[in-house]
Amino acid sequence: MSCCGGKCGCGAGCKCGSGCNGCGNYADITEQSSASETLVMGVVGTQKLNYGQAEAGVATEGSCSGCKCVYCTCDPCTCK
C-alpha cells in the first residue's frame, strides 16, 4: 500500500515528504499520456547485501511509507 493513496509530498532536499498533497506516485485514472517510457535494465556492481541490509536500504532511500521518490523535483513537484 502506498502512502496517502499514492501521493508523496516533496520535502527538504527534494526527498519524499510526509504530506498527502504531493505529486502522484502512480498515474491517476483520469490522467492520460501519449508518451512512452523505456525501461533499461542491467547488472550493476558486484556488492552483495544480505536480505536485512537490502530491506533497510529500501526503507531509507527516498521513500515515505512505500512511496519512492527517486526522480523528484520540487518546482514543479514530480515524484516518480
Swiss-Prot record:
InterPro entries: Metalthion_15p (IPR000347). GO terms for molecular function: metal ion binding. The keyword Metal-binding applies. Pfam families: Metallothio_2. Keywords: Metal-binding, Metal-thiolate cluster. Metallothioneins have a high content of cysteine residues that bind various heavy metals. Belongs to the metallothionein superfamily. Type 15 family. This is Metallothionein-like protein type 2 MET1. It comes from Fragaria ananassa. The gene is MET1.
